[in-house]
Design a protein with these regions (language model features):
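Active-site beta->alpha N-cap acidic-glycine motif
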Residues: 2-97
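Catalytic domains of cell-wall/extracellular-matrix polysaccharide-remodeling enzymes
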Residues: 81-175
Length: 175
């Protein structure tokens, strides 16, 4: 087709493929064990995998959840509550709880914004100002989307915007 032959096309104009907006890249992270089963169901609906970040207390309180996450092919990471005085020690305790339960540890950690990175972990940081799914989907830069409630609505927003949704892993190219 020549542009002038398309309905609404202007003679002599062409669309620059480089000018077309690329789909957003969004790395998915899930927190809050109370909503993780709903998040798993939403991910399954969209045929996606996610990274789920648990505290030591969440691992100890709901060990069945850890097994369900792993059985569904999701990645387990660790997190600490906001205001944790010693994030590195809290991560070590959570990793020990995980290892006692499933005989494996993780290097993946999601820490509060401004926390110091814990040695020996691949640390990602929750955004200081949380990003919504709509903001992440409209962005041209990669975003970390931390979901703790209503994952289905967030995933729908990403899906309808053709965003590229990726599981946050130790090897993720997100800074």
């Amino acid at each position: 087709d020549k542009p002038s032959e398309r309905p609404g096309g202007n003679p002599g104009t062409q669309t620059d493929p480089a000018a077309e907006k690329k789909p957003a890249t969004v790395f998915l992270a899930f927190t809050d064990s109370q909503t993780m089963r709903d998040s798993m169901a939403a991910l399954k609906k969209y045929s996606l995998q996610g990274s789920f970040f648990l505290t030591e207390d969440e691992i100890l309180t709901d060990p069945a959840l850890v097994f369900e996450l792993l059985a569904a092919g999701h990645t387990i990471g660790l997190t600490v509550p906001d205001g944790e005085a010693d994030p590195a020690a809290a991560l070590a305790r959570a990793n020990d709880a995980l290892a006692a339960l499933v005989c494996q540890k993780t290097l993946l950690a999601l820490l509060p914004a401004g926390a110091e990175a814990a040695e020996g972990y691949c640390c990602f940081f929750r955004p200081a100002a949380p990003v919504t799914a709509a903001e992440a989907a409209a962005s041209e830069t990669a975003h970390l989307l931390v979901c703790s409630a209503d994952a289905d609505a967030a995933l729908y927003t990403l899906y309808t915007s053709d965003a590229r949704t990726l599981q946050l892993l130790e090897t993720s190219d997100y800074a």
